[in-house]
Amino acid sequence: MIRPIAVAIAVLALTACGGGGSNSSSSSSLPQGTTPVKLDPADFTTNIDNPYWPMRPGSHWVYREVENGEALEDTYDWYAQDSHGNLWYLGEDTAEYENGKLKTKEGSWTYGVDGAEPGVVVPASPKQGMTYREEYYAGHAEDAADVLKVGSQVQVPLGRYRGALLTRNYSTIEPTVEEMKLYAKGVGPVMELLVSGGSGRTELLSFSR
């Protein structure tokens, strides 16, 4: 399910076992569709330096999406970077609220549990036209993304950024829903816009390292 950018992020060391991961960021080597992947911890690094989302343990980004003045969702996401610079998405713990009360945790998933597969949120060297899976948990989380532009401009409450990465994000579960996301160099995701299947806007309020 397509969801707002996380309100808090935990950087994890990969502990799964298996074969090698992607060794480049061409679309053909990135995770696609429902195809399983096996990630080898030896292919990963604790130095998270992808230029469009650098992070280290303790990094904290704060976002807000509101409707009628109320927060809709809190999410914790887990990421790891391979030695080539691809930033992998390994799971999320999400909670949606309605009238201030927990409504559902639908969409939560963890790589390797109940058939859930990881995806990539930011390729090592994104290029226009790239496409890749972001997450796959059958019937619950089936997001993918296309790179639309490298070099966009964006302004959010925290500031104005040039050279941003612009992606189109969509899900086979919600085929009428489409979002655009922008990632600023040296910062990470700064804006998310729902452009089809509704309306909504998520912006970066603050972040710390």
Regions found by a protein language model. Give the residues of each.
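Bacterial N-terminal signal peptides that target proteins for export
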Residues: 1-6
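C-terminal motif of bacterial Sec signal peptides marking the signal peptidase cleavage site
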Residues: 13-16
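Conserved functional acidic sites
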Residues: 18-209
